[in-house]
Structures are given as C-alpha cells and as structure tokens.
C-alpha cells in the first residue's frame, strides 16, 4: 500500500482503544460508527485529529505556538499519510452575546463592506437620500443644465435657528459679501430688517450670480468652494428665472442628479449631511456597521441590542395573591413592617386595603405601587416597635427604586438580588438592531443592514440575488465581488439545512448540531483542499428531509480533494459513505476494537457487526405490539402558543403516555415544548423564574407535581463532579467506608472519604490527582501527583479497605464493576444499576464530568431520575435524547423511557429519529417548513395517523420505515 493513498495508523491505544491498526483511504468520505462509548471519538478525534493538528502546530515558530492550543501527543505508535486537520465538533459556537450567525459565518463582514461601498444614507427627517459630492461633481451637475440658465450660488449659513444674527451679518459685510437671502427674500446686507430672536430663520449668503455656459467651470468651482467653507460643507444653486423643468437632465445627467434637488434649487453637500435636519454621517466605512466597535455600536446598549430592565411580571408573579401575603415579590421575603406600612399609606391615598388581591386593584393604584406617585405627596406612618414617625413625600415606586439601587450599588450580592427581577428587553434606542442611528440610516434597496440580518437565510439569499437590479453601473461593478462571497456563503447555509435561521440569531442559542453545520458551511466557503476534516455527528437536530442536502455537502467537501472522517450513527450517512469503520464490540472496556471495515455492503455482510445487523434488518428497534390508550380527560392542553414563529398553536399532550414532538428544523418544536410548556409549567409547579414564550393558557397542570427537563448540558463544570456524586451514589459509598471497622477504629467520618474537603484528601494536589504545570510554548502539562500517584486521597484514608479495595479503587471501577462490587449494599447498587440500565455501564464511577459527552451527561441525568421514588405525576421533557446513540443504544434508551411511562409519568421528547417516533403513543408534528414557513400543527395523533397526512414530511419518511420493516417481536433489545 502506498502511504500517499492511505492514512496508516499503527498501535492506537488512546483511552479504551486496544492497540488498533487501521488503514483509511485518503480523499474519501469515511464514517466511523459503533456503540456509544466504544471508542469512535478516541480514534477519530483524540488520535487522528490530535496528531494531525499537533504536527501542523509543531511546524510553526515557537512565538506562534504560544498563541495556539496544542494537543497532547496521542498514545499511538505511528501514523503516516496525515494532512493538516480541522475538527468540527459538537460544541456550541460561542456563548459571547456579541457572536451571531452573521459574524461566525463572516457574512456580516462582507455585508458591512457592501453597505460601506454602495449603501446610500437617508435623512431620518426627510426620508430623502443624503449624498456627498466633490466640488468637481457639483460643477459637472451645474454645467449639465441648459445653457443660459441663470443661477444664484448661495451658502446656507443658518438653517431654522432662532436669533438676531446682527454680528454674523456684520462679519459677512466686512468680508466683502453684499447680498443675503433671509427667510426667502433677497436683501442688501445693510438693508436686512431686524430679526425677531424668538423665531427660527433661514439665511443664505449670495456668493455669486452666474449664467450657465461651457467655460464657467473655474469661476463656478471657486464660488462653490467659498460656499462650502462658509456653510460648513453645504452649497445651493438656485434658479433665478424659472424652476428646473420636471425630469430635466443633460446628457449623463441621471447618473449625477442629486436626490436633494427641488424644482427651485439644487442642494450640494460635501459631507453626508441632511440639509434640512443637519443629520450628519461621518465617512461611511465598514466599522460604522460593526456593533463590536464603538464607532458603530448603539451607545445606549453598547451594541448588544438588549437591555436589562425590571420586568413587572417578575415583580408581581401571581396576580391572585393579596398584598399583605407578598404579592409584591421583592418585598415578600422581608420581615420588616416597613413595606406593609408603605402599602397601607398608599391604600389610604388610592382607596384599597392591604388584604386586597393585586387583580382587584384599580389601574391607578397599580401604577402608583409599581412606578411611583409622580410628584403626588403621600403621608406615611412608620412604627417598627422601637420608634414611631411620620413623613410626607412622593412615593418613588417599586420599579424605579430597584432600578436606582441596581445602578448605584457596589455590592455584588445586592445587584444579583435585584437581577432576579430583571429581564432582557430590546434596546429602545436601536430597536434591537445594535447599531447607531447613523449606521441604520444607510440603506440598499430601501433596507438598512439591521433589517437584512433579521431576515431568514432563505429570504436573505433571495434578496441578495435580486438586489443588483437596483444598482447603477458603477455600484454593480463595486458590489460584484462582495455579492459573490455573500451569495456563496448563504447558499452553503441553505445546503446544510439552516435556511430558517436569521443572521442576527445569537450563536449561544444554537443547538450543537446547528453550530456544527454553521462551521461546516464556513469550511466549504473557505474552499481548502488536501485537508483532513473530522466531524462529530453533523446530522444532529436535522430532519430526514434535510439529511440528503447535508450528505451532498459532505460529498462536496470530499470532492474538493479532502479526507472527511465523520463519527455518525445516521443510517443514510453510513450507507452513503465510501468507507465505514465499525468500532466495538461493546462500550468502554468492552470496546476499542475494529469489528468491521469496508464498504457499507461489507459491514452488512459481517455477522460480528451490530451496526451491520441493524442496517440489514436482521435486528431492529421494535414497534410496540399495541400502543397505550389515550385518556380523554387526563391531558395537558397548551392554548394559543405564539412564541418565535408559532402561529397561535393549541395542542393536547395525553398524560401517562410517550409523546414525540416532531417536524423539520426550525419548525417550532423547541419553542412549543421548552420555551412555552416547560417554562410555564416549571414556573407554576416548581416556582422557577424562567420566562415562558407568549401563550394564552395551559390546562391540566393540576395532574402534575414535577416538571423536569433532561437536557444535554454538562452534569458539572468542574473535574470534581462525576457520575457518582451527581446520581447520589457517592454519599452511601462514603458512608459505607466510614462504617467499616478500620475506619471506626480510627474515628473517620464520611467526610474523610471526600476529595473536596481537607482531612482525607491528598493536600499536595488538593484532591485533583493531577497538578497543572503551565508551559508557554507547549500545551499545559497535567502531571500525576507524585504524593498520591493520582489516587486523590492521603495514605491513611487509602488504608481503609473493603474487599481489598480502597475508596480510590472504587472510583476507578467501571459502573458495571461497581454495581457487582456493591451487590450487597442496595443503597449503592441500585443507583449504579440505573446507570447500567441507561447504557452507561462502561464509564468510570469517578469519571470527571467534563469528559462526558452531551449524550452521556443526559443519560446520567436520566439514571438519577430513574433511581428516584416514582410519584407517577412527573412530566419529563427530553430534547433529542438519541444524540450520540447507536441503533442498539436507542433500543435500550426506549426501554428506560417506556419504564418511566409505565410508572404513570408522562414523557415528551423532541426527536427526528424515526426509530423513536415509531414507538411513540402520540405524535405532534409541527411545520410544515422551518422559520416563517413553520409554526403550525401539521398532524397530530398516533404514528399510524401521521403517515396519512400528505403535508407532513415526518409522515412521509415514517410511512417508508413502517412499510419497509414489518412489526416484529422485541428481538432488538436482546
């Protein structure tokens, strides 16, 4: 084999890999698949990508290396045939509130350039374009008029300002000027009548009187320059005899004609300045349109587009509460009588009692409590038991008081307390567009840059394709290359199924799949060749309908001359690959071997490959023999959901069932389920402060006692958090060790076995097991602590043994081994067995939370819920729980979810995976398209009902699946 044609890996042992030898064809689309935790990412990211990136960075100078994060050398004997590597992982792009889809894809940078070069500023006062001209352009415009036209050349020194202007007129006379036009009438300067200083005046200085003829240029240029100096960049050519004929232009005149022309005069400006309002724009440069630059950012919100403001709904969370029972939330916790006595005084003035509910108060009384008495003085009587006094003053109002204290306080605690009652609102100065008025006055095709970023990518693409029709020849020439870059990038975003996003969408609000596909679009835009791309499940969050477009994109990346390695479980992706590598046979310590490799057909033919069995149909996720009965009375009903793109949606979710919310990306699933139902229900039932999206009402919440969103966020942000601490298994483990005879003899308490507190932990590394050493030109090195040798505890703590194992040995066991080891200790065993049940038997009991993938973190949370005593009245909400799961893992996950439902709970999932949708009792399909074209209920009912609906894309793909695979017994979950 020639090394140039293959990436040759020898002896890969990173994480759980078992000395893997592998030859991967270059310039091909390669899919790595296998069970969750089998070692796919260890091979693709931690070995191949890490080595490719490390070698590239190593080739740079020491100075350059200090700015780049350098990967550790993977545990591998040899890798040949590598190219510089780029990884596109499942991480949200950026939590920075200044990062948007437009900035990440660089489309916004090109838009700034386009607006700076061909945008036309408009006056907010007149709505007319503001143009800047050179003296030569002004001269050309005048010479282009009909020969013999008589003109006054005027300098408008005063525009609509009050004053007498005697001094200014005297100065003009000294300089040799003789005539002025005051408020529309011509005068000799000596004869100007006294001006009333209470009224606004217009004064134009007559600089010259000319008759248009071809040899006028030099004199005209001098006169215009004098005007521009006198009037701060403005000059007027006014017709002495007749007005400018309608539509009159000399040859070439249309291109030069100023939009500031009337039939009596032509106004010239050498600056971007409105002659009417004086609204000026500095020189138009790309930075004027940057909300990350003080030159362009809105000064009120500093370019964020939002402001923190006190939200009246958080001040009065429950309108049915009485004033004396804490209706005013910021005052509710205080034990001081001050607040009640304040309300009593306001009650006397506005005619209400403190026993009244908020909903019973008059509008005037509500406004007085919230926003103050606006100068009306109120007599307050205060008595705190120690002293009594009376004061008469206006009442400031709850909201102004909180806003003032928030601005004035230096205490972080006070600020945090007040922020509990604040919400983000669009900035009133820029309406959420993030830019200064000057930037928003510049338009192309009657739209400013902010309006275009608010369009969906689909609409923006159409707008940019049509816009050059409105350009003149010069503008077209300038814009051509910029438009090409913008159109290409928008096309790539369309191709990866993101046409429903807006360019203004905050990067932090994107799902992992969306942000990965955005980075994918940016990579295609860069047009690199000879690169090794490593991708992590790019199909996440993508409906089957858009899958083909994504796969086309990956093939396009390959056809440019790149090697594309994709870690993926999606059936279509595996079948479209040039080469498939199946890692297994199971997860964790039971994985790490190459089970099968070759074409998709080779994988299907391999009897050892679990993936092959699912692809060929030998195994499958079974459709339930019968679905649960749907109760007509026990149901949740969401009425009038209108958040984001939802169009007044009302839908029922039957309680005690497994419901799937489906639809294309951007159809409104997350808005309906997470932003509306979950936030509203958790606010009502759990007392959370989350802000739900707009809706009318939700019925049926009385049937629930808990609402839990099991998402893919990390279970802990520090290496000290692990599955044992999160699920609560670590507490009984520590208790058990503290109860052992050796521990009792030494007087050890459970705290002795914690690595978070002094006592039992190793103080050299403070219980971390490793010590970080900063290396400025190399990656930071974590060296194993030489005192405890990575065990995290001191020697005395490690002397306490159970069945010959110390607490450190227990943390190093896999969950499966731990469950067996503690088989006689139900408090520990039961919690660890739930982790095994959700398919996490392969992770370590003490594995650092930061090393778990999103899918693994979600299943740890699921295990925690399973181990709780069931009330049968919980609503579980999961957003794409099959992320990172192999077909076989999906079958296991479904068993767990259905077990939660069997306990009487309700499980609702947002899901694109047809294997999950086909097992649901009830399906709500939103769409039909993404973005503006979505937000409606397309179909609702059992999966068999969904396939009948012609408009439902989910139904079309589900129909194929149900017809292709007949119902079978539960062979899959063997």
From Swiss-Prot:
GO terms for biological process: nucleotide-excision repair; SOS response. Gene3D superfamilies: ABC transporter ATPase domain-like (1.10.8.280), ABC transporter ATPase like domain (1.20.1580.10), ATP-grasp fold, A domain (3.30.1490.20), P-loop containing nucleotide triphosphate hydrolases (3.40.50.300). One of its GO terms (molecular function) is DNA binding. The keyword Nucleus does not apply. CDD domains: ABC_UvrA_I, ABC_UvrA_II. A zinc finger (C4-type) spans 762-788. Pfam families: UvrA_DNA-bind (PF17755), UvrA_inter (PF17760). Belongs to the ABC transporter superfamily. UvrA family. This is UvrABC system protein A. It comes from Brucella suis biovar 1 (strain 1330). The gene is uvrA.
